[in-house]
């Protein structure tokens, strides 16, 4: 049985751990609020961008662009968005597991795909598994600006345009709620989806100058880059939600453990006092 000192030391160390997890929970909650606000604000821009691009793409049969056209797939690119730090529950593990499962099902060899990875957790695991990483980015800011990821986004789009790969997917955790993040695969290139859905309005509302084709040449790469940035904002909100939930659970578990240890301490202390009283009474009886 543990001594009173051992139990007391465990109580004190668990209380210190609880202070840390509680602080991390509060910090993550504050970061989550800012990340949600940023993602929601950016969605307004992204929605309008989709509408404009869709209208240009549908404006006439003469408009075309390599980024809108399907081509035979010889190689596939994947952008993986993970976190730089852990303590976020299954945020990274579930994402990596699902992506690698999909890759193994789609491709017979590593020559058929390449990975662009954001986040130290994902990069380190992919290196351990000797996966074909062609570009990486670590130390992503908690509140990233477009300039923070513009280099990676631009090079990803350029690699598709140059034929390094023939299609490009983004893998990230979509924010549903602080307790729920959904692993998401989004096809980025080619941009066939801009011709579909309800995002576009009547082209009669727009007049294009100098021409639809010239505007497409300028706008499409920027639009694709904006999709990468939008996914990153979503992933950041998911990361902070997952970490806040994980730290909340850790704080609750620490509190439960402290209660259990306190009960054990009181019982052990009571037993020690009872033993001392018994010994005193026994000694007094022996002297009579």
Curated annotation (Swiss-Prot):
- Record's PROSITE patterns? ATPASE_GAMMA
Against InterPro entries, the record matches this protein to: ATP_synth_F1_ATPase_gsu (IPR035968), ATP_synth_F1_gsu (IPR000131), ATP_synth_F1_gsu_CS (IPR023632)
Q: Name one GO cellular component term.
A: proton-transporting ATP synthase complex
Xref: SUPFAM superfamilies: ATP synthase (F1-ATPase), gamma subunit
A biological process from GO: proton motive force-driven plasma membrane ATP synthesis
Q: Where in the cell is it found?
A: Cell membrane
Q: Does the keyword ATP-binding apply?
A: no
Q: Which GO terms describe its molecular function?
A: ATP binding; proton-transporting ATP synthase activity, rotational mechanism
Q: Which CDD domains match?
A: F1-ATPase_gamma
Membrane topology term? Peripheral membrane protein
**Which first-to-last residue range defines the signal peptide?**
none
Determine if Ion transport is one of this entry's keywords: yes
Instruction: Tell me the keywords, alphabetical order.
Output: ATP synthesis, Cell membrane, CF(1), Hydrogen ion transport, Ion transport, Membrane, Transport
**Protein role:** Produces ATP from ADP in the presence of a proton gradient across the membrane. The gamma chain is believed to be important in regulating ATPase activity and the flow of protons through the CF(0) complex.
Entry similarity comment: Belongs to the ATPase gamma chain family.
Subunit info?
A: F-type ATPases have 2 components, CF(1) - the catalytic core - and CF(0) - the membrane proton channel. CF(1) has five subunits: alpha(3), beta(3), gamma(1), delta(1), epsilon(1). CF(0) has three main subunits: a, b and c.
| HAMAP family given in the database record | ATP_synth_gamma_bact
- What is this protein's record name? ATP synthase gamma chain
The record's gene field reads atpG
